[in-house]
Amino acid sequence: MGIQSTGIGSNLDVNSLITKLMQVESQPLTALAKKEASYQAKLTAYGTLSGALSSFQSSLSSLNNLSSFQNLTAASSDTSVLSATTSSSASPGSYNINVTKLAQAQIISSAGQAATNTPIGSGTSSTISIQFGTISGGSLSSGVYSGATFTQDATQALAEITIDSSNNTLQGIRDAINAANKGVTASIVGDGNPTNPYHLVLSSSKTGTTSSLNINVTGDATLQSLLNYNPAGTQNLTEITTGQNAALTVNGIAITSTSNSVTGAIQGATISLSKVGTSALSLSNNTSGVQASVNAFAKAFNDLQNTLKTLTGYDATTKKGSILQGDATAVGLQNQIRGILNTAVNGLGGGLTTLSTIGLSIQKDGTLAVDASKLSTALSTKFSDVAGLFATAGKASDSLINFSGSSTATKQGSYGVNISAIASQGSLTGDLDITSGSIVIASNTQIKFTVDSAVATVSIAAGSYTSSQFAALLQSTVNGNATLSAAGAKIAASVTGSGFLKLTSDTYGSTSNVSLEDVSGTSLSSFAGTVTTGTPGTNVTGTINGQAATGSGQILTGSSGTNAEGLSLLINGGATGDRGSIYFSRGYASQLNTFLATAISSSGSISSSKDAINQNLKSLDKEKQTLNSRLYDVEARYRAQFTALDRIISNLNNTSAFLTQQLSALNNSNQ
């Protein structure tokens, strides 16, 4: 304490007396310190519990994710020839594959130039337009085609690169093409020629016959003479490598692919070709991976139980309970987890509804035991149903209906699906027959396209086109527009049986539409007739479990307030009427993950309990401050009292000494 004194006049040990008195007075402070230590210990215990719950939640990630069950294991007998990956739509199977050709990209080269940094042409702003398509017919000699035709691939966007005085060197052209990242790679190769050694080499970024190049330069004449390349006409570049498709057989069936990543040959699998040769390919369920995940789940659960036992248990030997013994939060969490594991799930209609059906059982001590043989059998015979036992999953009886998602409100169960209208795409169909003659597009022709909600003004390359060529040009040009691409807006262009131009949005639903507006150059009336506004698409409509559902594009979602609330289904076409059932399961890993995420969140039960303790600690701190202030005053009072006592005793001692002296003097005078 702050006040110090000793019994000078009384010879009393004042400090010792006050210390002993204050020890008695401070007993409430000692009690508060013990209570504070208890609260701090609980905070530490809650931190340990939260960490254990978080570790348990981490063990659920692979089981909670449906893709862990859907992606098959692909094994190639010769990985130097091919390898494969799978998606959720793949099925187990075995395949013999013979690769006879690898896909390759077309490569063309310019005439040699004396230097790489010397300006080419006048520097007038020019545009390099690159189409991608197929070269057919004719013959190829010394890198030049004769009598060939070029058919544009409408699915590949037109590439346009601007060249002006800032980049009209060989290096500048190379860098501009590469920076555009529009499907062509440029490089400069020197052949050692003493006069003109440097060649601009252009390679299609995609392999296959449909990605050959057709290059047209508008603007500077020198650039035109260097780069114009039409396999069906003028060719100022020579072909070094011909675009080629991959060729292979899968179980004896001939397959061609524009890419060495072959899709579609085996449903749900992508085959990556590396060299010519043969290999067996096996697709199988990832049973070993899932079994390892289940074992990891069981171990993590048992680790959590051991932590809970340590935190909430009672030691009969010491007759002491753990820090969280009887704690409502800890016991409540433990009971809720056990409740989830002891409750059957509906599953996906395959008969697996409890953990015990796949060999997992709760023991008397609360731990989870795994029957490896029973688990292995379940994974081998009912793999997809095991997925429904753990993950959030949906399985439709109709192959054209896919489970798309759910919400926390979606109830487990089987729901009937009835479709009253299939979703459609927005489209614009002209009323002018464009097949009877050529379509001539003037220079500086621009059209404003509105695709869905995206709007952009698009320049159409000048030229004379057949109806199919023009449709391909429009599709590639629109889909190559940066503004529309950024918005995810795409179209498909075609010519109807009546010869009309048809533009169809890539999306479905009421927001899907296409409209056109003249800006400059050739009028829309030259190829679309009088039609400039398309017909919007429509949303899917129908019911889930007999109750009206909400349609958005091809997605049908269960309405609020129903058992199917939030259940989303992708309706990939098909007929109207009853479409079978969708089985929805919220598996154990899914339920536990949702529960644990809430439990350890900032608004969960552990955080609430910790907040309450922290509030108690704040209250304790205030009590300590008040008590310390009172003790300070008590000690000061004791010291004041002892000081006064000391003075009195000192005065009495002085009086006693005086009287003693006087009596002694009196006695001496009487002698």
Go through each PLM region and give its residues.
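Short, charged, intrinsically disordered terminal tails
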Residues: 660-671
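Mature extracytoplasmic/periplasmic domains
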Residues: 316-329
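Bacterial flagellar/type III secretion structural subunits and associated motility module proteins
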Residues: 1-34, 50, 58-199, 203-307, ...
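C-terminal or internal capping secondary-structure element at the end of a domain, subdomain, or sheet
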Residues: 649-652, 656
